[in-house]
């Protein structure tokens, strides 16, 4: 597996702060992956070997880190922060995915928080998929809907000051208030639904209103 981060520095930080603690705290992984500091482990911060496979963490700005060994699974993370080219070698996502050309069962995953509409990499990738969204049923009218930030409403005091602690979700169909506890139940009981024809690629969109943690003290609009 190749996990591609925006830069090589970010790849090292992600490996130390996210990957290493996960391996350390998950018993089945601890037994499989030797610590990079262990003598003769063969592992480094950016490359972990284990029985049956390996994980390489690379930077999209480093053509060298995108070269060498073949990879079956390519996970490109935070692609909207990638440079347009890995040095002079071209698009880093294409370079990474070419490493899986020899596998009939290759898997490509592209993820990111979207940035600017119209120039976002992940938006362009999502538009090529069946565009699955998380649909939830209103606790009042039972109509399924996707949760949007436009559905968040709040009160103002007599001076026009916003009162964030009064923020609540409004059903897009019946316009009734939905409490945060009701929202959590909605999200837990929701389902993925494709909103475009399937042409070989699955895509998933999920925003912060579907998050189940941390507990909210009002909503922050974005």
Residues of each region from the PLM?
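Phosphate/NTP-binding elements of NTP-utilizing enzymes
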Residues: 1-222
